[in-house]
Amino acid sequence: GVPVELVVAAPERYGTALVRATGSAAYVAALEPLPDAPTEAGVYAALGLPFVPPELREEPFAGAPPALVEPGDVRGDLHCHTTWSDGRASVEEMGRAARDRGYEYVAICDHTPAVGAVRGLTADDVRRQAEEIAAANEVLAPFRVLRGIECDILPDGRLDLPDDVLAELDWVQASVHGGQRMPGGEMTKRVEEALRNPHVRCLSHPTGRYINRRPENALDLERTFEVALETGVALEVNGLPLRLDLSGDHVRDALRAGVRIVCSTDAHSVRGLGNMPFSVMTARRGWATAADVVNTRPLRSVLARDR
């Protein structure tokens, strides 16, 4: 079973109990003795300290805490699917729903054929989908629907679509789906080869995990971060509740290595666009600020191929 700890506190000490329950032992010890306060903010005020969000209560640090990314900082969703592959809404429906959430842009990233379990887009499909995206942009302007793809990384590191097709797109996500049990050296070489493709902008769900269903693959993340930094490829924080990949710990390691991240929903329906808070909360656990997240930027910056 899953252990559960129930904390009961009087209203006037509720904030104190929250700080104790959300901080690590080392962090709380550095604050002792904690004053009684009804709110967390009250605890910090009584100590004469700036408020520290729960995600940062791991270890004591000097100075003001960084301003972590908030859901409201996100300007667009860069990983969504439609009925062209395994999604349940059309291009226009996904675009309209993203616009209604206050976004400035959304990238349609349907699968390519090698994904196997679902229908993937061929080169001809990608070009036919472009017509539907153009029509949606006429209706939804100034909101922008981006031409994207979630392109499978083949076992040898090649991508599942030719370069001339990828060059036409606004946003290319590279993903491993099959072969998750590949040995670490082979998996790392496979992903590195894909990251060196000049059209790739982001590596999707890098560790391939399904929480409580499938463990992380054997990808050498330290090496992957080095290559991502060298090539300018961002790493995704996938907001599907089963994935949350990168994890908070991996996000922190990526940021320490100088790698940028993308907060995405991997939405397969209009409802799936609501996964963004899960992605942002995971990024926050890795101490991500808005400046660390590609899609907190305006569209012109996202489209700039500043790898």
Regions found by a protein language model. Give the residues of each.
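Charged catalytic cores and adjacent phosphate/nucleic-acid-binding surfaces used
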Residues: 1-82, 88-102, 106-108, 113-143, ...
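Active-site catalytic microenvironments in core metabolic enzymes, especially phosphate/sugar-handling
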Residues: 148-151, 278
